[in-house]
Amino acid sequence: MAAAERDIAMIDELRSAKVETSWLEFKVGNCSPEMIGKYCSALSNGACVEQRDRGYLVWGVDDSTHDVVGTDFIPEMCKVGDQPLELWLANALQPSIAFSFQTIEHPDGRLVVLHIPAARQTPVAFNSVAYLRIGPTT
């Protein structure tokens, strides 16, 4: 199976979840850096609690229907002050985690996935606050 097919299969598997979870969040267009930081903390900690390897924040999927609607969010174009979003986020998360953004061209629209490793020995905090999700709520 080619990488693009694996990526689409991963997205379709995530979309098959009946509801968002402590380790999975869908967004259409909200790309607020503060929101992304809070979700990184919450999804990392939620993945740890649920004994998953990682959490996911997916842009371009409707959070109520789980339909692919696409997104125009381009993480590489976002800045916080003079810093690129990824650098700003890396500095705001403690302990440091190896998150990564991925763009996926799904047949129904362009998606961006933020892969967030599960917290390990200590909860992940954003700006010194550790967040946690209870089901779909942060």
Language-model features, listed with the residues they occupy:
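Conserved N-terminal catalytic/coupling substructures associated with nucleotide/phosphate chemistry
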Residues: 1-138
